[in-house]
């Protein structure tokens, strides 16, 4: 009887050790994968900011699905949308130049996670003499996987008369399986618009990939 009890005790001990080793290996694998993601996508640690708001909680795999979609489409050039509205000031029109990019987030195995979109809208005032004056820039996103925060845009004019704009914004994630840490990923936005032709192009690129 004692030998039977001893046998079962040994089995339980070996099972516990095996489970502990498996959990340890799994933790090390997750940590290693996350370190690789940091290097690949340019992930940075972030601090709580009232402007960022409540950041959705996602797994590292879900975050990677978003960032990989952006990385793979970094060279995609899209056409601007625009519309003329009532001007901010008397004797002029307001031109809204809108840039929208839609993506599908998928895991490494190809499983669909979510479709999401990024949108930048830049407002200009056009006076009666054709003068173009920058008003403001707004950033919006359609997703529950992250928060997107941008601050204005840098604008200049080329010799051909094109308005060129660029900015660096940030995607914020709270990663549930990495200690619920808060991280941010820089996204570069570049575009140009010709107000005479009413045409323009733009692109979104992970800043890490752009360097």
Where are these regions (language model features)?
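N-terminal propeptides/leader regions of secreted preproproteins
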Residues: 20-110
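Mature secreted bioactive peptide module from preproproteins
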Residues: 85-211
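Positively charged n-region of N-terminal signal peptides that target proteins for export
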Residues: 1-6, 20-21
């Amino acid at each position: 009887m004692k030998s039977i009890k001893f046998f079962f005790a040994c089995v339980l001990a070996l099972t516990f050790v095996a489970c502990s080793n498996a959990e340890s290996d799994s933790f090390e694998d997750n940590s290693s994968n996350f370190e690789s993601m940091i290097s690949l996508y340019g992930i940075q640690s972030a601090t709580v900011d009232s402007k960022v708001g409540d950041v959705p909680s996602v797994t590292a795999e879900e975050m990677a699905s978003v960032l990989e979609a952006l990385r793979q489409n970094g060279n995609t050039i899209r056409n601007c949308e625009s519309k003329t509205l009532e001007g901010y000031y008397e004797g002029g029109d307001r031109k809204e130049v809108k840039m929208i990019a839609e993506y599908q987030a998928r895991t490494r195995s190809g499983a669909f996670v979510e479709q999401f979109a990024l949108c930048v809208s830049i407002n200009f005032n056009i006076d009666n003499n054709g003068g173009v004056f920058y008003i403001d820039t707004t950033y919006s996103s359609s997703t529950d996987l992250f928060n997107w925060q941008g601050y204005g845009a840098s604008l200049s004019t080329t010799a051909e008369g094109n308005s060129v704009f660029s900015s660096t914004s940030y995607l914020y994630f709270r990663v549930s399986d990495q200690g619920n840490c808060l991280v941010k990923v820089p996204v570069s936005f570049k575009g140009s618009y010709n107000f005479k032709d009413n045409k323009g192009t733009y692109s979104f690129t992970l800043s890490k990939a752009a360097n």
